[in-house]
Amino acid sequence: MSTPTLTDIPAEAEARAAATGSLLRLATAGSVDDGKSTLVGRLLFDSKSVLRDQLAAVEQVSLDRGLTSADLALLTDGLRAEREQGITIDVAYRYFATPRRSFILADCPGHVQYTRNTVTGCSTADVVVLLVDARNGVLEQTRRHLAVAALLRVPHVIVAVNKIDLVDFSAEVYAAIEADIRAVAAELGVAEIHVLPTSALLGDNIVEASTSTPFYEGPTLLGLLESLPTARDEGAFRLPVQLVIRPQGAAPSPELRDYRGYAGRIASGTVRVGDPVVVLPSGRRSRVAGIDLGERSLEEAVEGQSVTVRLTDDVDVARGDTLAAAGDAPQVLTEVDARVSWLSEEPLHPRARVLLKHGAQTVQAIVRAIEGRLDLDDLTTVPADRLELNDIGLVRLRLASPVPLADYSVSRSDGAFLLIDAHEGGTLGAGMVQLAGTGRGEPAAATSSGRG
């Protein structure tokens, strides 16, 4: 399984948007041929986010295919195989901005065998735009994507009932599909959902309001995206340490001789000079002496920024540790229940040995039990003795080393992890910690398990 990379996103623009709180991460999903890539292309085109040379390239490829107009889906179909097959098979990322907001957009695949890519695209999203073909209504893959959005606790879900022009802009068809969507969303516990009729091909209700849907009086898709609130700064401070920075050999200058900093990308919250922090899993405490961003010193840094934090005490901190707000740190656990979206073609069985990766920390783990699987037909949890590709199940894991974790419903950054093949290094599954109401989640023994 390939690891998607974030392309076409100016690093300075992303950092600036993250710092101001104007950045919105969105993902598109839906069944194959629902028009996801066309909708994204229309959104980019109508919001004037397409460069002239990009549009010229799309027009030329469209002409080569024998089309009479530009195929806007090509604006996001970045892989050669996508262009040849006409389907999105990986997550295509795009950065764009309007006067009101900056966006990182992930266009996810629709085929059921690529659900794992959809999990990747939705895992960091503030909003998921789910497309439903007005001719087909709610399908199993629609339910699957809604289940993934609910599982990943995506704060906002927008459902675009697309290709509404192909059912003659029928108010009755739209009303029936909207009712089905809201019923499924309620069963899955989707927190907030918006539904609107669209035609990505013609542009109805994407950027400009449609005159063909008088039965819909709500905002356009872009209007929704520009107005949705984000809660990116409300979580407690977390910084998974990616690198310990300390001069090797002779320091280039006296002031750097005793320099020691802990570099990483802030996963949640805000940190300020003077804040008390705790090092996890050891539990040692200190205060923030300084925050460095390149050659600049900052008084504070926020979620999404990559910084180096210096502490007032020479405590033991290593790659894989987490710096957390001292007054609001997660539990350090060695046993945990989690919802797991299984992404491997090889089934998951009890007693399987895997690696669990959380932030920058990777530990050995064993599957203690598989306690159920989500049935996408009736949205109930049924008994299961294994998880197959694209299954979503409840799994109990025993960890070889303590890991700081929290319930995913409380904190997406503290509650998310990956399961990795210990031999080949491939991603096997995405997990969401489920502690609330289970009575499970075994804390590690007091900090003696940390390094001495």
Whereabouts are the PLM-identified features?
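C-terminal effector/interaction modules appended to NTPase cores
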Residues: 2-26, 34-37, 98-99, 248-452
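P-loop NTPase switch module centered on the Walker A-proximal segment
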Residues: 4-113, 125
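Residue-level signature of catalytic and energy-coupling elements of molecular machines
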Residues: 33, 39, 58, 86, ...
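Alpha-helical scaffold elements adjacent to nucleotide-binding pockets in ATP/GTP-utilizing enzyme cores
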Residues: 39-43, 57, 117, 141-148, ...
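Active-site phosphate-binding and catalytic loops of NTP-dependent enzymes
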Residues: 65-70, 77-89, 184-193, 223-237, ...
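Conserved Switch II/interswitch segment of TRAFAC-class P-loop GTPases
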Residues: 101-103, 108-114, 122-146, 150-175
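Canonical P-loop GTPase G-domain recognition
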Residues: 155, 167-236
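Accessory interdomain/linker segments of ATP-dependent helicases and helicase-like nucleic-acid enzymes
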Residues: 201, 219-263, 278, 285
